[in-house]
Amino acid sequence: MKIEAVIFDWAGTTVDYGCFAPLEVFMKIFQKRGVEITAEEARKPMGLLKIDHVRALTEMPRIADEWKRVFGQLPTEADIHEMYEEFEEILFSILPSYATPIDGVKEVIASLRERGIKIGSTTGYTREMMEIVAKEAALQGYKPDFLVTPDDVPAGRPYPWMCYKNAMELGVYPMNHMIKVGDTVSDMKEGRNAGMWTVGVILGSSELGLTQYEVESMDSVELREKIEIVRNRFAENGAHSTIETMQELENVMEHIEKQELIIS
């Protein structure tokens, strides 16, 4: 078996270490309405189309109960759209600062391309958001061969449509000749639903939720415990393999090509 393409997520996988761009914005739009949500809650739906992310937050039992306490009723679809419009406005203003490629990504991409492997990408950001992120990332040396956003297909993650569109545009089939790499549970589900080899990256991920400084300064035992929690979460949601950093990806690829991993 030969791997012919790798499909990467963006924030938390290839750019924006820790996936912090959307986090505080999600928290802020709820806080403005007197409903406090935690960073852990805000991260849980990460990877979804952002309006679906807002909707998923309103459906969490604790948040829904707090909203009902404040407003006397559960959030409506109008509330969701109002918050999403605010989310977009704030996010657009900060996105250029959160498009820096994560350490090691550019080198791994270059190595994959030397092997003739095509580079695709999917995201939970809209096309308009990605015009900002992709442009800034390209200026800093990261540009995949193709990008698909939820706007380009009938639905975003966990549906497989963005991966399928990448496969068509890159001219690669069958799907088990491709790897999906991401940093969220929804990435794992997207890859598995598409019939692809699916790999979760841990350091810099939304699931780990730490800055690079926090990772580097944390007690090694505590950090290892957190890494293993994320590793298990990825495995429970379909990851065929996990890597701590992108530099380990080619090693996983070699195991796949030697048929030392089994797709199921």
Curated annotation (Swiss-Prot):
One Pfam family recorded for the sequence: Hydrolase
Residues the entry annotates as binding Mg(2+): 9, 11, 183
Annotated protein name in UniProt: Phosphonoacetaldehyde hydrolase
Top-rank taxon, per record: Bacteria
Root EC class: hydrolase
SUPFAM superfamilies referenced in this protein's UniProt entry, alphabetically: HAD-like
Active-site residues, as the UniProt record annotates them: 9, 50
An individual GO BP term: organic phosphonate catabolic process
Known cofactor(s): Mg(2+)
